[in-house]
Amino acid sequence: MKKALLMILDGYGISSTTHGNAVKNAKTPHLDNLMNNNPTIMLQASGEAVGLPKNQIGNSEVGHLNIGAGRIIYTGLSLINKEIENKKFFTNQALLNAIDHAKKNNSKLHILGLVSNGGVHSHINHIYAIMELANQHNVPAILHIFGDGRDVPPTQLLADLDQLIKKAETTKTKIGTISGRFYAMDRDQRWDRIDLAYNNLLSNTGKSFADLKTYVKDSYQQNITDEFIVPAYNNNYKSDEITIQDNDSVVFANFRPDRARQLSHYVFGSNYYDHHPQLRRKNLYFVIMMQYEGINPSAICYPPKIEKNTLGEVLKNANKKQLRIAETEKYAHVTFFFDGGVEVEYQNEDKVLVPSRKDVKTYDLAPEMSAAAIVDQLLKVYTKYDLTVLNFANPDMVGHTGNYEATLKGLEALDHEIGRLLADAKKNNITVFFTADHGNAEEMIDENNQKVTKHTTNVVPFSITDPNVKFTKKEGILANVAPTILKYLEIQIPEEMDQEPLI
């Protein structure tokens, strides 16, 4: 009866560069031995290999989703891009409902969203697609522009305006208002900011412009960049032609929830916040791109998809015992995200949350983090489980501080704990599957000697501590991990896992 342990090192990528590479330069004899003396290949952990757009850096959420699901999980940006490309977007029921509501009530369709190609909260192409859809159905559309300046250069909006204005003309869309994201997309309950943006949408109070480009240029003259553009309305139209009125449809084009939630609460109402605007329009049909926590709109374009037969569910159905263990910083990743982005409790499953250090503000001050406590707890219990899933946070969380020396220390402290774990696993005949969710600690100083704190697009290792295993490929993707473990444990791979085992 084989038993396995899946050890995920968060932010542990592989790069041939030596400069600024904490992974390569740390003294980690146990990890080196693990990779050099056991079957090892590399896995792609970024971009299209994990359901993100090409060349987009990986992240912990997406990484664990793909590892646990055994299939590529398409999220936010790439999911909607794909739908626009294959034209399914134009038959999306939530959007068609908004169109129908506007037609039935002889009213307007308002499009709210961050107008930028940053791809973090929204994408300008998604907004264009909604404008096209309204035009196809002869529904009057009003665009309310939120300036970015954070996920793109601070004055990118001006460069995008020619194309935007042209697109508005061809789709017969009126540009109604403009506001910097500082106001329209606040997430810290600074309601005075939301008030300015919201009142501008409802009743055209405050500043106005006759020419949008001039207004943006004038803002720049006053050192007000896209993010901070003061809410203003287009005075070429009567107020009720461009403001949100009773019976209108409203589509919020942002797919990321955190900065769309407060304005959505103002527009449509929710129980999420105690603070409410003085006025809300009646009988709105309010559509959001993806689920925003606490907001119950009329419809969601892409509601959360329940992934069937993730690794955890397959083990449960096979009556296998499983353990999930991580410190606080990454606990959600080995549970919620690993299970397909849902909270589930399986029978024969235990979850151990090891507290992250609270006595330090940043982890470069305690780069060992809680690795020792994780191993202490693990060694007491893990032999009774068929599969243990474990996350060590050090390479990622210390890597994010940009402190190279501390990251070396963190990796070396972690290696010591991994040494203890590997020795015990060997003694108990437990096979260790070792991988990472994305890169980070291997690129900490760039060629200009500047600190690098972000994730990378580098590959991650995949090692198995069984000399009898032979990999069938030289390289794979994160979604190959789950089917590989199932094959090793001689458990049938479900059809939902469309990625093949690598052994």
UniProtKB/Swiss-Prot annotation:
CDD domains: iPGM
Record-listed E.C. numbers: 5.4.2.12
GO biological process, one term: glycolytic process
Gene Ontology terms: cellular component: cytosol
Binding residues for Mn(2+) 2: D10, S60, D437, H438
A molecular function GO annotation: manganese ion binding
Cofactor(s) needed by this chain: Mn(2+)
Pathway it works in: Carbohydrate degradation; glycolysis; pyruvate from D-glyceraldehyde 3-phosphate: step 3/5
Broad EC category: isomerase
Keywords for the protein's UniProt record, in alphabetical order: Glycolysis, Isomerase, Manganese, Metal-binding
Residues that, per the record, bind substrate: H121, R150, D151, R181, R187, R256, P257, D258, R259, K330
Domain of life: Bacteria
Binding site for Mn(2+) 1: D396, H400, H455
Catalytic activity: (2R)-2-phosphoglycerate = (2R)-3-phosphoglycerate
Manner of cofactor binding, per the entry note: Binds 2 manganese ions per subunit.
Catalytic residues identified in the record: S60 (phosphoserine intermediate)
Coiled-coil intervals, chain numbering: none
HAMAP family found in the cross-reference section: GpmI
Function summary: Catalyzes the interconversion of 2-phosphoglycerate and 3-phosphoglycerate.
Family per record: Belongs to the BPG-independent phosphoglycerate mutase family.
Oligomer status and interactors: Monomer.
Record's protein name: 2,3-bisphosphoglycerate-independent phosphoglycerate mutase
Species this protein is from: Mycoplasmoides gallisepticum (strain R(low / passage 15 / clone 2))
